[in-house]
């Protein structure tokens, strides 16, 4: 990737790439100080931003042209210079000469400085634009225009980047203010303010991505019906008063935060000058500033509301707070809206302060001596729920909804707090999906039957590679329900003892994948119990634990799911780790999880896994590396996976594997033997669960049963409404906890170090 080189002292000589040498400079427009950026409230620091060896120069009196002054003078740019611009995947970064025209509110670029008097190669309007920093490349900034265009730019150094960001944001802010003062009630463009940066901030520290907890989206939405526009405006006056009250409370909390940070000592492990704390101060202030401007725009729109007798023009627009005007006051006050009422609804995507939260369980905490018996075994029944339903392709109205969503998102945007349309939901919770990874419990329990550490680690790798295919239901990429804080899922499996054998012993008779191996006599089977719980909502952390007392085996795992928008796909990173403990052997196998990707989200979405995961046992010295290969752009196979098991003390590879994680896997051992496993023919052991009427109120299937019911009927509106009710109940409970300053206490898991462990694990009780 070509990158801009830093300038040398005096602006000449350049770096390794002289064509990319940045020569940005501010030019005088002949404006008075009152018309300069400093006069508009933007802090210009001539000393800090001065020319220091080829950098940018800025002064308060000569930064920008006065929009109103200058008479018949030739209009001059506020800033110009060389930046690297990302063009496309093949050409990468290219040096271009950029000119910022403050008076016109335009960012233009040319091939080089000599061609700047010709027609520009590209022009980006800065009115209502968002300027944010990016970690994709050094000294990178991204400019998002209000019409959806985007420029990815790189400066030569941090000072150069800072100058451009400051001036671009000042220009965007100025023109947004001017447009809101002139015709606030008759604008026809669509403006979206996203928490990737804010044009209202001139602080250097604030010019980075806002935290993921930042508030969401304020959109200007066109209403075709003038009557609907008048009704919407009349509804907002009282609602905005409540928003103002909430803003006042948040401002007070932000002041307390700043005071607490500034009260920290000047030395020690944590000081008031800590980089992360400075960023926290800046982003919180910038967020409030942005929200304040949005609220001012909304208030101006309400004041401009026409009387009932007035007939506005067809182009009149409504400033909407997070969504359609028909939503309740409580939703507006919370700053959140539920998912789409239907696939063709009038939508504005809202970013939630918390990811799909619902009411927490009011059941008492488990007693410390209650043991790991989570549910009554005699109440459990085999799960007969049909998982093989055929899903149709994306319908046209659904595709338009997804396309609208994509237009609201930015590359790399965190989707953890984005409300997704209900029709893309899978009919199960994420906690149940983790349980479905255990659909081959015979392979898991067979690990303990290995006679040597080598046999056991290879058996674990075999189980690991065959676990993921059953966790994915159907061919289409569907999103499971986001577990709410306090949600739990319980199930178990019964595995006939004659099915649990080491791979080195004589193989047992094959069973069809459509057969469900069951033990008629419970005494002739092993019992594997499973419990999962959502222990945190920010970040969203799920924990699950399973154990088999008879085999003295248990698995404890915590996973933080972090999703990211990647254009035509969505990536989900599963951050965390699991530990498999074999108590009879004193071995602990630590493992991580791959990332998941939903591809082709506009047509027929499909899922693939990607990334490198590690499995290691400190006691035996064995480790394994498993690589899930994503499909390349051109050619290549899908769902490919490779693995290698190694004995670290002797640096010996004892096993290699390759194939497809949802198809055929071939294992080659150190003794020359090979083994082929077809995951599609492996027997699937059904889960055993209690019926819904005997499940607790916070157990996944009971909690989501109404949503699941309406999704099965195809009633998206009703499913969306049920989901919204769950979310609203949870927000009420969360506000109660905040008021009482009562921290959330998970029911079955406790924090330990950087992770979470089951409160009464097998290794502590046996």
UniProtKB/Swiss-Prot annotation:
Keywords (A to Z) from UniProt: Coiled coil, Cytoplasm, Cytoskeleton, Lipid biosynthesis, Lipid metabolism, Lipid transport, Lipid-binding, Methylation, Phosphoprotein, Transport
Modified-residue entries (Phosphothreonine), positions: 198
Modification type Omega-N-methylarginine: residues: 40
Localization annotation: Cytoplasm, Cytoskeleton
Binding residues annotated for a 1,2-diacyl-sn-glycero-3-phospho-L-serine, in chain numbering: 415-420, 482, 563
GO molecular function: cholesterol binding; phosphatidylserine binding
Positions of region (Disordered): 1-76, 306-337, 356-395
Stored InterPro entries: OSBP_sf, Oxysterol-bd, Oxysterol-bd_CS, PH-like_dom_sf, PH_domain
Binding site for a 1,2-diacyl-sn-glycero-3-phospho-(1D-myo-inositol 4-phosphate): 415-420, 479-482, 537-538, 723, 727, 731
Pfam families in alphabetical order: Oxysterol_BP (PF01237), PH (PF00169)
Signal peptide: none
Annotated PH domain residues: 76-173
SMART domains on file: PH (SM00233)
Biased composition (Low complexity): 17-48, 57-67
Biased amino acid composition, Polar residues: 325-337
Comp. bias intervals (Acidic residues): 366-383
An annotated GO cellular component: cytoplasm
One GO biological process term: lipid transport
Modified residues (Phosphoserine): 31-32, 59, 62, 66, 203, 211, 225
UniProt domain comment: The C-terminal region binds cholesterol, 25-hydroxysterol and acidic phospholipids and is required for localization to microtubules. The PH domain selectively interacts with phosphatidylinositol-4-phosphate.
Assembly notes: Interacts with OSBPL9. Interacts with DIAPH1.
Function noted in UniProt: Probable lipid transporter involved in lipid countertransport between the endoplasmic reticulum and the plasma membrane. Its ability to bind phosphatidylserine, suggests that it specifically exchanges phosphatidylserine with phosphatidylinositol 4-phosphate (PI4P), delivering phosphatidylserine to the plasma membrane in exchange for PI4P. Plays a role in negative regulation of lipid biosynthesis. Negatively regulates APOB secretion from hepatocytes. Binds cholesterol and acidic phospholipids. Also binds 25-hydroxycholesterol. Binds phosphatidylserine.
UniProt-listed PANTHER family: OXYSTEROL-BINDING PROTEIN-RELATED (PTHR10972), OXYSTEROL-BINDING PROTEIN-RELATED PROTEIN 10 (PTHR10972:SF47)
Protein name in UniProt: Oxysterol-binding protein-related protein 10
Lineage: Eukaryota, Metazoa, Chordata, Craniata, Vertebrata
Gene: Osbpl10
């Amino acid at each position: 990737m070509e990158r801009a080189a830093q300038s040398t002292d005096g602006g000449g000589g350049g770096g390794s790439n002289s064509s990319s040498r940045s020569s940005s400079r501010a030019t005088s427009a002949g404006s008075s100080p009152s018309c300069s950026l400093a006069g508009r409230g933007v802090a210009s620091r001539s000393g800090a931003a001065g020319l220091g060896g080829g950098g940018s120069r800025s002064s308060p009196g000569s930064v920008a042209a006065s929009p109103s002054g200058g008479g018949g003078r030739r209009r001059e740019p506020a800033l110009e210079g060389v930046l690297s611009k990302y063009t496309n995947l093949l050409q990468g970064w290219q040096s271009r000469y950029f000119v910022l025209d403050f008076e016109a509110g335009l960012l233009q670029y040319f091939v080089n400085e000599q061609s700047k008097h010709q027609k520009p190669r590209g022009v980006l309007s800065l009115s209502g634009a968002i300027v944010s920093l990016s970690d994709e490349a050094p000294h990178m900034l991204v400019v998002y225009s209000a019409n959806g265009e985007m420029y990815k730019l790189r400066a030569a150094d941090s000072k150069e980047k800072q100058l451009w960001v400051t001036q671009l944001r000042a220009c965007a802010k100025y023109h947004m203010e001017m447009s809101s003062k002139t015709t606030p009630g008759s604008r026809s463009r669509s403006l979206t303010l996203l928490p990737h940066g804010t044009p209202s901030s001139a602080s250097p520290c604030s010019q980075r991505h806002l935290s993921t907890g930042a508030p969401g989206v304020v959109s200007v939405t066109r209403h075709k019906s003038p009557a609907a526009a008048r009704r919407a405006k009349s509804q907002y006056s009282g609602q905005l008063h409540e928003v103002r009250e909430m803003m006042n409370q948040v401002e007070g909390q932000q002041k307390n935060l700043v005071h607490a940070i500034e009260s920290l000592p000047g030395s020690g492990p944590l000081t008031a000058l800590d980089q992360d704390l400075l960023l926290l101060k800046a982003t919180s202030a910038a967020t409030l500033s942005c929200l304040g401007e949005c609220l001012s725009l909304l208030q101006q729109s309400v004041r401009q509301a026409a009387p009932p007798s007035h007939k506005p023009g067809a182009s009149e627009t409504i400033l909407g707070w997070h969504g359609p005007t028909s939503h309740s006051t409580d939703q507006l006050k919370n700053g959140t809206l539920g998912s789409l009422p239907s696939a063709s609804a009038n939508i504005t995507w809202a970013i939630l302060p918390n990811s799909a939260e619902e009411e927490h369980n009011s059941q008492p905490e488990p007693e410390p001596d209650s043991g790991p018996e989570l549910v009554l075994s005699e109440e459990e029944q085999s799960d007969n729920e049909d998982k093989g339903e055929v899903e149709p392709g994306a319908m046209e109205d659904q595709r338009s909804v997804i396309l609208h969503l994509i237009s609201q998102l930015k590359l790399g945007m965190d989707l953890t707090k984005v409300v997704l349309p209900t029709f893309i939901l899978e009919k199960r919770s994420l906690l149940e999906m983790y349980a479905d990874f255990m659909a081959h419990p015979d392979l898991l329990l067979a690990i303990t039957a290995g006679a040597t550490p080598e046999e056991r680690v290879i058996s674990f790798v075999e189980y690991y590679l065959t676990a993921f295919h059953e966790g994915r239901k159907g061919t289409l990429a569907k999103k499971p329900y986001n577990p709410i804080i306090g949600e739990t899922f319980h199930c178990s499996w019964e595995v006939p003892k004659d099915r649990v054998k080491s791979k080195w012993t004589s193989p047992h008779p094959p069973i069809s994948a459509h057969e469900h191996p069951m033990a008629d006599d419970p005494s002739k089977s092993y019992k594997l119990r499973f419990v999962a719980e959502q222990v945190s909502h920010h970040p969203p952390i799920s924990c699950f634990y399973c154990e088999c007392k008879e085999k003295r085996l248990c698995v404890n795992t915590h996973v933080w799911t972090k999703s990211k928008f990647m254009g035509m796909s969505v990536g989900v990173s599963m951050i965390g780790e699991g530990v498999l403990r074999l108590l009879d052997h004193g071995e602990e196998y630590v493992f991580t999880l791959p990332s998941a990707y939903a591809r082709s989200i506009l047509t027929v979405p499909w899922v693939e896994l990607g990334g490198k995961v590690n499995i290691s046992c400190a006691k035996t010295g064995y480790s394994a590396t498993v690589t899930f290969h994503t499909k390349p752009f051109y050619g290549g196979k899908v769902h490919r996976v490779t693995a290698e098991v190694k004995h670290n003390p002797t640096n010996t590879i004892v096993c290699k594997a390759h194939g497809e994680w949802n198809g055929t896997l071939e294992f080659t051992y150190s003794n020359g033997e090979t083994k082929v496993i077809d995951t599609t023919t492996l027997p699937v052991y059904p889960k055993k669960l209690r019926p819904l009427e005997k499940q607790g109120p916070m157990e996944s299937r009971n909690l989501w049963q109404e949503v699941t019911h309406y999704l099965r009927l195809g009633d998206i509106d009703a499913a969306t409404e049920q989901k919204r009710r769950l979310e609203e109940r949870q927000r009420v409970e969360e506000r109660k906890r905040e008021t009482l300053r009562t921290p959330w206490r998970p029911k079955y898991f406790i924090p330990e170090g950087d992770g979470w462990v089951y409160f009464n694990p097998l290794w502590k009780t046996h």
